Design a protein with these regions (language model features):
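Glycine-rich phosphate-binding active-site loops on the catalytic face of alpha/beta enzymes
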Residues: 1-7, 74-85, 133-151
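Alpha-helix-loop-beta-strand connector modules within alpha/beta enzyme cores
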Residues: 16-21, 43-46, 92-115
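Conserved anion-binding
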Residues: 1-70, 78-83
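Non-membrane alpha-helical structural segments and their capping/turn regions in soluble enzymes
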Residues: 5, 61, 93-101, 145
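Hydrophobic faces of well-ordered beta-strands that scaffold small-molecule active sites
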Residues: 51-56, 74-76, 114-117, 135-138
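Non-catalytic positions within long, well-ordered alpha-helices that form the structural scaffold/packing
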Residues: 68, 129-130
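C-terminal helical cap(s) of enzyme catalytic domains, especially alpha/beta-barrels
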Residues: 5-21, 129, 141-157
Length: 157
């Protein structure tokens, strides 16, 4: 979660390697996989990393343009945002909808993607797509469990 441009910039710096940031190399990661040259590994990380600051507070809504200038995407934490707006889990109310519209419009203005941390219960994902949201995280636990159970069910014992 970020609330200011300074926090967003610090987040970006801590995720990227020198010269774009100050991320620790944590040992010999560049030797894992296809990279033989450590600089190539760091450049690949800097170029391919997706940085996702979460927008969950009134302060962040007030600083949205400044936050959106930083490289990355804007991700909404729907529950936390609704609580911060004084409308806990009321995803249909006007206050919440205006906040979503502001976030989607700001992301579009800055040429970045807006996303939702999850799709709130009983809401149609197309509703958010029509507002301009481009990606959604999904609750992976139940899906992973179903996939594992499905895969294991085919094993003859």
């Amino acid at each position: 979660m970020v609330n200011t441009r300074a926090e967003a910039e610090a987040m970006v710096r801590s995720c990227r390697y020198f010269p774009l940031g100050n991320r620790s190399n944590a040992g010999v990661r560049g030797e894992w996989g296809e990279f033989k040259n450590y600089r190539d590994y760091m450049d690949a990380v800097n170029n391919e990393l997706v940085i996702v600051p979460m927008i969950e507070t009134n302060q962040a809504l007030g600083n949205l343009d400044a936050i959106a200038i930083c490289p990355g995407v804007l991700l909404i934490g729907p529950s936390d945002l609704s609580i911060e707006l004084g409308v806990p889990l009321d995803y249909q109310c006007d206050i919440y909808q205006r906040a979503l519209d502001k976030i989607a419009a700001t992301a579009a203005k800055h040429g970045i993607a807006a996303g939702m941390y999850f799709i709130p219960p009983a809401m149609d994902p197309n509703f958010f797509v029509q507002k301009g949201f481009k990606f959604f995280t999904m609750p992976w636990g139940p899906w992973a469990k179903a996939g594992i159970e499905n895969g294991l069910s085919g094993i003859k014992r």
